Amino acid sequence: MKTKVIVVIGPTAVGKTALGIDLAQRYNGEIISGDSQQVYRKLDIGTAKASPEEQAAAVHHLIDVRDVTEGYSAYEFVAEAKALIADIKSRGKLPIIVGGTGLYIQSLLEGYHLGGLVDQEQVLAYRAELDCLSDEDLETMAEQAGLMVEGNSRRRIIRGLELKKFGENLENTESGYEPLYICLTDDRQVLYDRINQRVDKMMAAGLLDEVSWLYQEHPEAQAAMGIGYKEFFPYLEGQISLKEAIDNVKQNSRRFAKRQLTWFRNRMAVDFYQVSEEAVKDRIYTAVEEFLDD
């Protein structure tokens, strides 16, 4: 029997953290963070990490598990999340994944799996490379590789290219999970306004101090490349004004939110929930309860 997993996804600033905590409390669950930046210790504000009070309200995993000097990959996330899901289930609780890093979550819950640990790391690295390509470039690669993909589905093209590259080492096996995807969204302008307001709140909470520490101590770290950090480096070097840096964070965050929604819409079988819609919580509760009772 497959393990049932609730998955709360959506663009940045849409309200995933609050919903995840609500569901964990209501359905005896524990939260696994599906965010590639929240793994880093000391980077609390810019990553919009759940506050100490929020983390006390529900058990959270995969937050503060890496130093900023360390890298983090989809392969590491998959390995650690699998172990956590098994542990959470063994204690009679419900695994709830909350985050916006689509590649990590999809790699865990869907797709092909390799037998060897080294091969698994290689295929996830290759998948990340393919994900950076445009639809047009992927279709060109598929044609060059002689792939015939029905409907030119981006996800099928990527899987086909993975099969072509890794051949018999790549097995089309079931993931062992039965996910219920709850994708939060909102009207674009409402979401963009919320993003802008959150950046302002981050600044008031001390984001610049957090960025300054990272810039002084570990400017070359993978963690420093995240949105909310890298935009301030030109300001700290005297190249742009603070207002320009803040505006760049807001703009990049809005663009990231748009990319996230495109990812979830095109590559994962998700149900969308408009957070500003009346009674949206009741709809979500009903979906979860029907899923768990099935």
Swiss-Prot record:
Enzymatic reactions: adenosine(37) in tRNA + dimethylallyl diphosphate = N(6)-dimethylallyladenosine(37) in tRNA + diphosphate
What is any Pfam family matched here?
Answer: IPPT
Top enzyme category: transferase
The UniProt record gives the binding positions of substrate as: 12-17
Instruction: Give the EC number.
Output: 2.5.1.75
Query: At which positions is ATP bound?
Result: 10-17
One of its GO biological process terms is: tRNA modification
The ranges of region (Interaction with substrate tRNA) come to: 35-38
Q: Which domain of life is it from?
A: Bacteria
Q: Which GO terms describe its molecular function?
A: ATP binding; tRNA dimethylallyltransferase activity
Q: Which UniProt keywords apply?
A: ATP-binding, Magnesium, Nucleotide-binding, Transferase, tRNA processing
List site positions: Interaction with substrate tRNA.
Answer: 101, 127
Q: Which cofactor does it need?
A: Mg(2+)
- What's the family? Belongs to the IPP transferase family.
Q: What does this protein do?
A: Catalyzes the transfer of a dimethylallyl group onto the adenine at position 37 in tRNAs that read codons beginning with uridine, leading to the formation of N6-(dimethylallyl)adenosine (i(6)A).
Describe, as the record does, how this protein assembles with itself and its partners. Monomer.
Q: What is this protein called?
A: tRNA dimethylallyltransferase
To which species is this protein native? Streptococcus suis (strain 98HAH33)
